[in-house]
C-alpha cells in the first residue's frame, strides 16, 4: 500500500471512529449481483465529491466514493457514506399537508392534515393571488437555496422574475456566500475563485482563515494532510480562528484571534510588505491592479429604526449602533486617517451606500496602513488571554514571513469565519489585497480561495442568479442591458423584468414581520431554523396575516411553522446538477422513484406556473411610489402570445423546450414520463409526464447566458460522460486558473502587460479620490484590472459587557448538515452526535462553578436556550468565548444570535454576539 492509499484508508477509518461507528460495509464494496451502479454527486458540502450509487429493486442499497472523481478520488467523509440513508428516515414527508379546521378547510390556526396535490395547489393559488392582488410583486417571496439543483434554481428564478415580475427570491446562500460574492465582484468584476483544488497539491503553504476544514470540508482537508505529509519540513500549515479546532491538529502555527480582528491582521501583513519588505512587492503584477477604498460609516445591516415596535428594550441598545456609535480606543487608532478619535460619535450616513468606492493612489494606500504596527495589532487581536503578547507577536511575524517569502507558494482558504461577518466583504477583499501585492494569485499553488459551504451555492445560487438582485451569468436586474439580454433569451416582451432589487433573505423575514410580504414559498432550506434572531421570524410566520408554503422532505422547524407543506423528492429521486467551489459542474441521473407522492421542486414550480395566465401578472404592476411596471400584454400579443396562455405554456412548455425529446435510457425520469406510482398531480389526474426532456431543456437554455462571456458551460450530454468540468469550458476544455494567460482562454484574448488579465473589469472606469472620498469628476481606467482595497478595522456592533460577558460563535460539526433535518434521521450519525453542546473553556466552567455535562442557559438580548456544556471536546474556545453548533432544533441557538449583516453583502454574522451563561 502506498502513502496515498494509506492516507485514504486511515482518513476514512478515522472519520468513522470519530463518529463512534463501524466502518461502512460498502466502503470497499465491489459490484454485487443485481446492483446497478451509476455516478452521482454528494448531497452535502461545496467540495463536490463524486460518489457511486448502487440501486436494486427500486431502492438505493449502497454508496461509495467514486475513484474516478478528481475531487475526492474515491474517498468520502462520514456524511458522504450515508447519502442513501438520508432518504429513508421514518418521518419522511410523503404527501401534502395543510392546516385545516374541523370541516377540512384551510385554517391558519388549524392542524396539519393530508390533502391531495390538487387541493394543495388550489389553496396555494388562492392565497398567492390574494397576496399578489393586495401587494403586487413585492408581496410575494421565495426563499431559495444553495442546495437547489441548477435546473430547480433556474426554473424558480425564471418563474419569479419573468412570470411574477418579482425579485423577491433569495437563497440561503445569502447566509453563507454573499460576502464572498460581493468581494469577487468588487475586486474582479466577476464571481467565483480564480484557482482550483489542485492548488493544494501545488502549494507550499496552506493558511486557513475562519475555516475549520477538518470538519466542514473533510475531503479537502485529507488532501491538505496528504500535502503536508508529502514534505513536512517544506509545507507549512497555519490555522487562524477564534477558537481551537480539529483543523489546528496539523498546523505549524495556530493563531487564536479576537472576533473581527482578522481585518487588522490582514492590514498588519500588508503593512509589513509595504513598509518593511518593499522588495517583495510584485510590481509587474500590480500593473494589472488599481488601489481603492470606500466609506466606513456604513452601519451593520440591522434595521434602521432602533425603536421598531417589534424590538424588546434589551435589543435596542445593540440596534442603535446601526444609526451611530461611539468609537472605541481601537477604532480611534484605525480611523484616525479620517480625522476621528476614540470617543467620537460616528454617524452611519452611508448605510445605504455601503458598496460605494473609489480609486486612490499607492501613497494613500500606504498611509492608511501606517497604524497597523505589530504592537497595535497584537494588542487588539490576541484572542487567548493565557497566551503571552510576545508569543502572539511572534506568530503574527511568522505568518507575515510565510506570505512574504519570495519563492514560497501560498494558498489562503476561508469559509464562514470570513463571510459571516459584519465586515465580511471587507475581509474578503483584504485577502486579495495581500496576495495581489505579492503577485501570488491566479497561478498554480498560489491564491486567495473562498470555499463554498453548500453543494451548489456556486452552481445554482450564484451562477444561475437566484439572488434578489441577480440574473444568470453575473448579470443584475438593475442593469438595463442585462435585462434586455435576459428578456431576449427568455423571449419576453421588453420591460417585463422588474428593474428594482428585491429584499434579501433577512430583509424578507423583516418584510414578513412588517406585513409587507403576505405569501412565502420555502424550497430546499429551513429558514425558520437557520435565520438569526429566530424568535422574531417565528412570531411573524404564526401571528401575522400571511401564507407560508414549505417544500421539504422532513418536518423541520420551518415545516412546523408553515401553513402548507409540500413533499419534495430528494437528490437521487430526480435528475439534477450541482456546481462546486472550484467551478466544477457535475450532473447526475434519477436513480430511484421518489417515496410516496413526493415530487421534485422543478415539478412543483412548473405545476404552479400552470395556475397563472399572462393577463394575471403581465399587466401594469405598481412596485412603489416611484416605480410602476408597464403593461406588456400588447407586446406579448405581437410575439404570438395569447393573454390566456399560462406561464407554464410561455416559460416552460414553449416550442424550444418541447424540442428536447425524451430519450430512451434505462433511468427513470418522473417529470418527463411520469412513473409507476401514478401520482395524482395538481389537476387531480394521474401525472403522465411532460413528454419532453425538461431538465435538458432548462440546462440548454440556461447555458446560453454564459457562452462567450467567461461563464461557458458544456452541453447537457457532455456532463453525463465526465466527472464534471471547471468552467469556463471552451472548445471542450475546462479552465483551472482564471485570469492567467497561460491557462484561461479569455485572458489570452486581452492585450495587457504581463501574464494576467482581469477581464471582469473590462472597459470599466472608477471614480478618483483620496482616503476621505471622491475628488472631482476624474475617473481612472480599470480595464482588465483588479482592485486592491484598503479597509480599516472596526468593532462589531455587539461586544461582551459586564452583563453579557461571553462571545458566542455558532457553526457546524462534521457529522451533521446544517439544521440536521436529514442527518439527524441517520441512526449512525445521530448516535455519534445526538445533541448540540456548548463548547467552553475549562477555566470559564470552573469560574462559573460548572462541571462537564452540566445544563446551562445561554442568554442574549434576544433570547435564551438550554444546552449541556463540554469542556473536553473537539473544540477548545479561549476564555470568554463559547461555541454552539446549530444542527439541533432542541438547542435552538438562533433564538440567541444577532441578525446583524455585512452592509455590502447582507450576509448574517453568526460568529459573534454577546451572551451570559448560568446554570439551568
UniProtKB/Swiss-Prot annotation:
Q: Where is the 4Fe-4S Mo/W bis-MGD-type domain?
A: 35-91
Q: How is it modified after translation?
A: Predicted to be exported by the Tat system. The position of the signal peptide cleavage has not been experimentally proven.
Catalysed reactions, as listed in the record:
2 Fe(II)-[cytochrome] + nitrate + 2 H(+) = 2 Fe(III)-[cytochrome] + nitrite + H2O
Q: Tell me which residues bind Mo-bis(molybdopterin guanine dinucleotide).
A: 79, 147, 172, 176, 209-216, 416, 420, 526, 551-552, 574, 601, 810-819, 894, 911
Q: Where does substrate bind?
A: 886
**Could you tell me the superkingdom of the organism this chain comes from?**
Bacteria
Question: What is its subcellular localisation?
Answer: Periplasm
Residues involved in [4Fe-4S] cluster binding: 42, 45, 49, 77
Q: Output a single Gene Ontology CC term carried by this record.
A: membrane
Q: Which GO terms describe its biological process?
A: Mo-molybdopterin cofactor biosynthetic process; nitrate assimilation
InterPro entries cross-referenced by the UniProt entry: Asp_de-COase-like_dom_sf, CT_Nitrate-R-NapA-like, MoPterin_dinucl-bd_dom, Mopterin_OxRdtase, Mopterin_OxRdtase_4Fe-4S_dom, MopterinOxRdtase_cofactor_BS, Periplasm_NO3_reductase_lsu, Prok_molybdopt-oxidoreductase
Q: Could you tell me which CDD domains the record lists for this protein?
A: MopB_CT_Nitrate-R-NapA-like
Its cofactor is: [4Fe-4S] cluster; Mo-bis(molybdopterin guanine dinucleotide)
- Region forming the signal peptide: 1-29
Q: Which GO terms describe its molecular function?
A: 4 iron, 4 sulfur cluster binding; electron transfer activity; iron ion binding; molybdenum ion binding; molybdopterin cofactor binding; nitrate reductase (cytochrome) activity
Which terms are listed as keywords in the entry? 4Fe-4S, Electron transport, Iron, Iron-sulfur, Metal-binding, Molybdenum, Nitrate assimilation, Oxidoreductase, Periplasm, Signal, Transport
UniProt-listed Enzyme Commission number(s): 1.9.6.1
| Cofactor: how and how many bound | Binds 1 [4Fe-4S] cluster. Binds 1 molybdenum-bis(molybdopterin guanine dinucleotide) (Mo-bis-MGD) cofactor per subunit.
Q: What does this protein do?
A: Catalytic subunit of the periplasmic nitrate reductase complex NapAB. Receives electrons from NapB and catalyzes the reduction of nitrate to nitrite.
The UniProt similarity line reads: Belongs to the prokaryotic molybdopterin-containing oxidoreductase family. NasA/NapA/NarB subfamily.
**Listed HAMAP family:** Nitrate_reduct_NapA (MF_01630)
Q: How does this protein assemble?
A: Component of the periplasmic nitrate reductase NapAB complex composed of NapA and NapB.
Protein name, UniProt field: Periplasmic nitrate reductase
Q: Which gene encodes it?
A: napA
